[in-house]
């Protein structure tokens, strides 16, 4: 009798099965694309397709994007352009870099990012030349957490990110890539997003960067070497101590080209010094201080920056 009762209870008891599902599949959270390495021209062997194709190899060759999934294309307005640029620069200030460039908004990069967002495709776009790409998708349309999610990959204890390309922190590396000085982003609402496990992710936010980050190359011994995202600042080589020639000034730890910058140049015919005036060629400079009095206005700028908030 006890045996039959035990068997009956076992049959009626609920069955619990644990599935190994990707992050965000059941939770309705935001997900980010895999970020693969970018090779220096001619450095990686042509047969190394897995490392060069970014994340396209996760899907079959017949998997194509369907622009019919697009519900509405939303180009960032002037306020959002400033907010996106400010957020990137805010996180770039956090790393101890001696050569970190200030980011500026690029309408050209924004247009290419918007084109890919409009495909509602979670895979990385093709045909980019020296342009990095980060992708975010979520069930909700407020993408104010996108840049923080990308940056916080560095804090993943299971990743062990060393500020150079790794599969688990490629988005972070692109955000803090010191040589990058241009960013442009686009956002789209979709009926569905292809390439995301599960359903409900109907919003896509894409950012393009130039120059691109996540660079790797092959050493003389045939080993892959991931270039560090920035030069470490320490001792006498503090922040901005290694600013490039095209961004010689420093503001809150970021290298930038001030307006009406007078670069001294010497001539061989005399001992006098002449000056030339160079203007930045970027399309939007929301975070750039004035050439004069930048240090005096630092506290005021910080107060203004803290006022940026986004609701989409």
Swiss-Prot record:
Tissues expressed in: Expressed in hypodermal tissues.
Residue ranges constituting the SCP domain according to the UniProt record: 87-209
Biased segments, Acidic residues type: 285-305
A biological-process GO annotation: negative regulation of multicellular organism growth
SUPFAM superfamilies named among the record's database cross-references: PR-1-like
Residues modified by glycosylation: 142
Family matches, as InterPro entries: Allrgn_V5/Tpx1_CS, CAP_dom, CAP_sf, CRISP-related
SMART domains: SCP
Keyword Protein transport carried by entry: no
Pfam families noted in UniProt: CAP
Signal sequence, renumbered to the chain: 1-18
Low complexity bias: start-end ranges: 265-284
Keywords, ordered alphabetically: Glycoprotein, Signal
Gene Ontology terms: cellular component: adherens junction; extracellular space; plasma membrane
Region (Disordered): 265-312
Record family assignment: Belongs to the CRISP family.
Function noted in UniProt: Regulates body size morphogenesis, but does not affect male tail development.
Protein name (Swiss-Prot/TrEMBL): Protein lon-1
Source organism (scientific name): Caenorhabditis elegans
